[in-house]
């Protein structure tokens, strides 16, 4: 019953006789010797029939035999795994004559390209860049811009509020107010930045980019504003576009206008809003509207980018799809 040397030798020969070099074959032998009905399991169960004096010595011999067989199994498994690995590596050999993989080079995001184009154009005309906080107060986002509490224009902004006084800015116009508070006319600034509104569809996202212009001087007038925007739009789109100004309404400008360009399909396309700075806005920052006047321009960067590159869904700019972004390198 306890011819352990014979059992060990039989196991060794069975392992050595395996030809297919598969782990499944080794597993079958392991089960034959170590499974619930295996040889060594039966031997261990038979210890209950051995006298108490002999049981420790017999048990030790059985364990020694088990360890020998297990070591043979483990060694054979390692050997076969190494053979399988070498065969797989030989099949996966690298052909050094093949061309290497090209490194993907990064590029500017189309929104960044548009911002740079706008800033570059107006910088040549003496406009400087000013920035402001994205978490804005009710005063700078609305009150100082001639949009008091309960004004119906507030309902159009779909504002993200933190509390009664703080919000995510819905426009970069607050930068204009902060600039006029700290600078004396003449003032020529651009205010690019992120703005936030609770809206999401094919032409709107909760976060988007605006660029606003502000020009304040003693002789600022609407004719000058029209000429400036004509030149800008033709330079930006690199075409001799038809441009029209439609009367509109903004609380912070008077008179106000929407600016359209003629599309290739023969339809007018809205591109930006503008107007003469409202006298109340100038008074709110301590500038005498009887002495100074100014004009302001607001443009959505994503909208300009969509029109320039014929993009139909604004959300494409924020989905990080490399197939889309590669087109703008």
From Swiss-Prot:
One of its GO terms (biological process) is phenylalanyl-tRNA aminoacylation. Its EC number is 6.1.1.20. Mg(2+) binds at residue 254. Binds 2 magnesium ions per tetramer. PROSITE patterns: AA_TRNA_LIGASE_II (PS50862). Keywords: Aminoacyl-tRNA synthetase, ATP-binding, Cytoplasm, Ligase, Magnesium, Metal-binding, Nucleotide-binding, Protein biosynthesis. It is found in: Cytoplasm. It catalyses: tRNA(Phe) + L-phenylalanine + ATP = L-phenylalanyl-tRNA(Phe) + AMP + diphosphate + H(+). Belongs to the class-II aminoacyl-tRNA synthetase family. Phe-tRNA synthetase alpha subunit type 1 subfamily. HAMAP family: Phe_tRNA_synth_alpha1 (MF_00281). This is Phenylalanine--tRNA ligase alpha subunit. It comes from Histophilus somni (strain 2336).
């Amino acid at each position: 019953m306890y011819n352990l040397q014979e059992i060990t030798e039989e196991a060794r020969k069975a392992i050595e006789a395996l030809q297919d070099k598969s782990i499944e074959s080794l597993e079958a032998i392991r089960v034959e010797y170590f499974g619930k009905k295996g040889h060594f399991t039966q031997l261990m169960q038979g210890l209950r029939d051995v006298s108490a004096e002999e049981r420790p010595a017999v048990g030790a011999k059985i364990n020694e035999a088990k360890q020998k067989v297990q070591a043979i199994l483990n060694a054979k498994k390692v050997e076969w795994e190494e053979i399988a690995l070498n065969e797989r590596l030989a099949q996966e050999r690298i052909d050094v004559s093949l061309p290497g993989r090209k490194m993907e080079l990064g590029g500017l995001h189309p929104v960044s390209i548009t911002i740079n184009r706008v800033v570059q154009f107006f910088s040549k005309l003496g406009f400087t860049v000013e920035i402001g906080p994205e978490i804005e107060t009710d005063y700078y986002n609305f009150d100082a811009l001639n949009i008091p509490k309960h004004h119906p224009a507030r309902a159009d902004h779909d504002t993200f509020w933190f509390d009664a006084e703080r919000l995510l800015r819905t426009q970069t116009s607050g930068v204009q107010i902060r600039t006029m508070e700290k600078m004396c006319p003449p003032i020529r600034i651009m205010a690019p930045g992120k703005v936030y509104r609770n809206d999401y569809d094919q032409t709107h996202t909760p976060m988007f980019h605006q660029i606003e212009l502000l020009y304040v001087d003693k002789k600022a007038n609407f004719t000058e504003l029209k000429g400036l925007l004509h030149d800008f739009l033709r330079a930006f789109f690199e075409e001799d576009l038809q441009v029209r100004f439609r009367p509109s309404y903004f609380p912070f400008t008077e008179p106000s206008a929407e600016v359209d360009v003629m599309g290739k399909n023969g339809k007018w396309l809205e591109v930006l809003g503008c107007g003469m700075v409202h006298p109340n806005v100038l008074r709110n920052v301590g500038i005498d509207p009887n002495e100074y006047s100014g004009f302001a321009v607001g443009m959505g960067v994503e909208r300009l980018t969509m029109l320039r590159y014929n993009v139909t869904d604004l959300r494409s700019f924020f989905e990080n799809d490399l197939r889309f972004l590669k087109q703008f390198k």
